[in-house]
Amino acid sequence: MKSDIEIAQSVALQPITDIVKKVGIDGDDIELYGKYKAKLSFEKMKAVEANEPGKLILVTAINPTPAGEGKSTMSIGLADALNQMGKKTMLALREPSLGPVMGIKGGAAGGGYAQVLPMEDINLHFTGDMHAITTANNALSALIDNHLQQGNDLGIDPRRIIWKRVLDLNDRALRQVIVGLGSPVNGVPREDGFDITVASEIMAILCLATDLKDLKKRLADIVVAYTYDRKPVYVRDLKVEGALTLILKDAIKPNLVQTIYGTPALIHGGPFANIAHGCNSVLATSTALRLADYTVTEAGFGADLGAEKFLNIKVPNLPKAPDAIVIVATLRALKMHGGVAKSDLAAENCEAVRLGFANLKRHVENMRQFKVPVVVAINEFVADTEAEIATLKALCEEIKVPVELASVWANGAEGGLALAKTVVRVIDQEAADYKRLYSDEDTLEEKVINIVTQIYGGKAVQFGPKAKTQLKQFAEFGWDKLPVCMAKTQYSFSDNPSLLGAPTDFDITIREFVPKTGAGFIVGLTGDVMTMPGLPKVPAAMAMDVAENGTALGLF
């Protein structure tokens, strides 16, 4: 079979002006970035606000293997299948980060015959959103350091600046740096560090803002440092929220592209789900809901991370909650959760599927807590056997969850038709009655305990010394009514990445909290989750090249 990029490059793309007509968008409603990419205008987003929202389908997954379980691919294939059934459907997905593209993942725009196009552009610089976010973030860093240099009227303690610089690359050497070295004219020497751009609070803000006014307010509410007397310093104190909004005025507009089958796709924003809230922008999802009868969206990593955050953090900012949740499972991941070594995953092992099913079962039970119907999608791989598939289907029937095999990677829309029909049937027959897991009025401590015990299956939460101090401080600052965004490994329900399956009787330790007051949540740090990833021994970048005619090579 052809590689992803060979398939993508074999497709005759339609002009984006033709694609968007399918959902009632005219040429005057978009700003073109070449023939095949566009941004949606503020005017059009405002004009459709009165429209009744369509059906919303959230795609999530079990705890993944390092290669991922195909959520984006499944989301794309499901949307294509729904359109093939005659349902007016749009996609609302995240845009890839260049760091993982060059690192472990290669391309991140779907796969096989379920891709968004032009995949080379989407995976590289796209419409420049990542660069705008990086620039806004680092402009704020420069303005903070300039404030220190020019007299420090706000009394910022250089030892307590919590705002870091960012870069859209995996670069472990930049995790901790010293800035301001050389001489007094180079600034005030202090410790600093770099995060990856998608971990920036500005990325989260862009994805939760509802318009330019809301974007500016959220930027003003960012906490960047503390004074010598331990009081928080906000962006509004520096009076630069207007400048940051100006840098982001185009980046806030959702991007329009197409799938291989011509399904319109809004791709916008890309926070990671293990260190941020893991969902595409509220603007993209809300607009898709008001343009189409069905919107398919995804949340990063497993349902314990992305879907939990989608349902607790993003949904309150949307016109409606999901009508159905699709949990993607692969037999290779279930076997891994059942104790099979990575090198042996290709061998048939029905017993391991049974043991690993505990992971999928917990995710199904967790999503049902939110009172939204659940469907399981088995993402088919060549090594899957009939006996393993039959075993998994029987286990799903035991817990009364609908299950369908999907082969969208190999067969595109046709490979997703059975899943699409089941999802539509479930939506028609089972009305969602969305219920949030916790209330804003709960304390931060109560919210964390709720997530750990109700979603992760943990026994208790241990708060480290710094976290205990912060619980008191944050209550004094009025931040304790914000939602909690857990930073945790994606590979396990616990904070130990090697504890697979569905562990119980474990504790999770919160070592510290990070205020993201502009985004409107508090991050709880567990384990050794890094906000600046490193590259693997053999980076995906080593297989990439460009032909003499400018064609991209090796993007998977």
UniProtKB/Swiss-Prot annotation:
InterPro entries: Formate_THF_ligase, Formate_THF_ligase_CS, P-loop_NTPase. The keyword Iron-sulfur does not apply. ATP binds at residues 65-72. Pfam families: FTHFS. The gene is fhs1. It catalyses: (6S)-5,6,7,8-tetrahydrofolate + formate + ATP = (6R)-10-formyltetrahydrofolate + ADP + phosphate. PROSITE patterns: FTHFS_1, FTHFS_2. Keywords: ATP-binding, Ligase, Nucleotide-binding, One-carbon metabolism. GO terms for biological process: tetrahydrofolate interconversion. One of its GO terms (molecular function) is ATP binding. The keyword Ligase applies. Pathway: One-carbon metabolism; tetrahydrofolate interconversion. Its EC number is 6.3.4.3. This is Formate--tetrahydrofolate ligase 1. Belongs to the formate--tetrahydrofolate ligase family.
